[in-house]
Regions:
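Conserved "landmark" site that anchors the functional core of diverse proteins
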Residues: 1-440
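A generic structural motif
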Residues: 17, 331, 468, 485-490, ...
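Short histidine-centered loop motifs in beta-beta connectors
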Residues: 46, 51, 345-346, 465-474, ...
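Short, flexible surface segments
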Residues: 55, 303, 355, 471, ...
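Short hydrophobic beta/alpha edge segments that flank linear recognition/processing sites
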Residues: 56, 473-494, 513-526
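Generic structural signal for buried aliphatic residues
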Residues: 59-60, 307, 359-360, 464, ...
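Short beta-turn/strand-loop junction motif enriched in small, turn-promoting residues
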Residues: 312-316, 470, 489
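Acidic, low-complexity mobile loops and tails
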Residues: 438-482, 492, 498
């Protein structure tokens, strides 16, 4: 329902990522890929500035050309090598630079999908295939291309490639411009893609990995409660994400949601979707593809290994952090911090899953899951896996044989989706608080202060977790006035001196911006 949602693709370091109405800049500790649109990327030479930012700072973006980015990189490297003085000034804004991110387009021809290549900052290019739809054939084409490029790397014919990350219908190539120029890389990509064999008869290895799932786990319920208390109490997906999934998909009961989740084989299309080997997967059978919108605004906290659905995709969160997928439960670890490298074990690498694995869930109680989670990283729980393969020819036959029932399911689903949209509009839930609403009480707003009045502002953006005082109350220096929750941390807002609380300017559970005025104190001496 939100225009920021896209089919998951890779994220560049420095990408400006619009997660619903909340933009963030992704650093080197950010996710490998995700399902939100990224309209721009901070160039490599300017990434150091992200580490200098603090709550309350204002960020202004300047548009640079690729040539300017290269010049800036050279100037910064020279300054660091000599340490002779301050870093050179940032190049001036180039209004004509990169009016479009598209650097190459190849239209569809016969059985070959269209390809678009986009610039992503100065060190990445993103190749996208076909229309904006979920199509497993497009993912297979991405796989064939990545395999061909890796072969060129192994033969020493493609220097300067740092990494490649596949998405649902895309491949992001991270390169070092000191070793291979963007235009030279583009020529290799175009030639390699043009020479790809057809995927018609493609068969890829596909294990079935059986994972325990604690349905509607208490930790996911806690995350929903925290969200309702501190972010958005009236969100349509609260208080039950599972009920929301049922409603928006036109299912008759929560048991139908349960049945689909536990019967569907989920094909892993990407890894690192929200950190640490986390899979993004979708059911092979379109009749089992539950579709949801994501949280807006996003959650500030998600339990490790929570299982959720966003768009048509399922994700297992690799670690605690923000998130937006609708919860169905919780499973075991996707990433092993303690034990890996054993040949033949499920953790030959730190990450558990592989591309094109098929996940099958089986139900366990919350207590069983806690025991499994305690034992699994240390080799104390045997995970059941079965070797197999995925054949595109067989899959096409399955889709053709079931075309009528698939179309009927999608039609019912679409009717329910539109009905949900209308409910939101009727209830006034289609829009959340705008930036203007937050800025209304910002540092530049006009407020009539009484004599001796003092404005108290929060230095961090977040949500008002607790209002500890009331109007007219006497406070002493150091008393807690409010508790602000920001990115999983709680910040106490303290009284600077003995005073009386004159006016509260925000409510418990509301959102606040860095620098926003939240209450007025009258100093005791007045």
């Amino acid at each position: 329902l939100h225009p920021s949602n896209i089919h998951d693709n890779a994220y560049a370091i420095g990408a400006i990522d619009f997660t619903g109405d909340m933009p963030v800049i992704l650093g080197p500790d950010g996710p490998s890929l995700g399902g939100f649109v990224c309209p721009a990327v901070v160039v490599n030479a300017e990434l150091w500035k992200l580490g200098q930012l603090r709550p309350g700072d204002t960020v202004r973006f300047h548009r640079l050309s690729l040539a300017q980015a290269g010049e800036r990189e050279a100037a910064v490297e020279a300054a660091l090598s000599s340490l002779a003085g301050a870093l050179p000034a940032t190049p001036s804004d180039d209004a004509d630079a990169h009016t479009t991110p598209v650097i190459y387009e190849d239209p569809a021809r016969e059985d070959v999908p269209a390809m678009v290549v986009r610039q992503a900052g100065d060190r990445y290019v993103l190749l996208e295939f076909g229309p904006l739809v979920l199509d497993i054939e497009l993912r297979l084409r991405v796989h064939v291309l990545m395999t061909a490029l890796k072969d060129l790397q192994a033969q020493g014919q493609l220097p300067g490639i740092i990494d490649m990350t596949p998405g649902i219908r895309s491949l992001q190539v991270h390169f070092d411009p000191a070793l291979i120029a963007r235009d030279a890389l583009l020529k290799v990509l175009i030639a390699t893609e043009a020479a790809l064999p057809p995927v018609d008869d493609m068969v890829v290895p596909s294990r079935t990995v059986h994972l325990p799932l604690s349905w509607d786990d208490p930790q996911t319920k806690l995350a929903i409660e925290k969200y309702m208390q501190s972010v958005r109490p009236d969100a349509p997906w609260c208080p039950s994400n599972i009920e929301f999934i049922r409603r928006i998909n036109g299912l008759d009961s929560i048991h139908e949601v349960f049945k689909i989740v536990f019967e569907a084989p989920y094909l892993v299309l990407g890894l690192g979707d929200v950190y640490l080997g986390a899979p993004v997967a979708t059911p092979l059978d379109p009749r089992q593809r539950l579709v949801t919108t994501k949280y807006n605004p996003a959650r500030t906290w998600t339990p490790e290994n929570a299982v959720g659905i966003g768009g048509a995709y399922l994700c297992v969160y690799g670690m605690e952090g923000p998130g937006g997928y609708q919860f169905v439960g919780r499973t075991l670890q996707m990433w092993n911090r303690w034990r890996h490298g054993e040949a033949g074990s499920v953790f030959e690498q730190p990450w558990l899953l592989r591309f094109f694995d098929q996940i099958r869930f089986y139900p366990v109680s919350q207590d069983e899951l806690l025991r499994i989670r305690a034992d699994f990283p240390h080799g104390g729980y045997a995970l059941r896996t079965e070797e197999g393969s995925f054949s595109l020819k067989d899959y096409r036959r399955f889709l053709a044989d079931n075309a009528a029932s698939i179309a009927a399911f999608k039609a019912t689903q679409q009717v329910a989706f539109e009905a949900e949209r209308e409910r939101w509009a009727a209830a006034g839930l289609a829009e959340v608080a705008s930036e203007a609403d937050v800025e209304a009480a910002g540092p530049d707003s006009e407020i009539d202060l009484p004599e001796g009045g003092r404005l108290i502002a929060t230095s961090v953006p977040g949500n008002v977790w607790k209002v500890a005082v009331s109007e007219g109350q006497q406070v002493q220096a150091g008393d807690v006035l409010m508790v602000i929750e920001s990115m999983k941390m709680e910040f106490n807002l303290l009284a600077p001196a003995s005073a009386t609380v004159h006016k509260l300017m925000c409510a418990q559970g509301g959102s606040v911006a860095a620098g926003q005025n939240v209450l007025v104190l009258i100093d005791e001496a007045v």
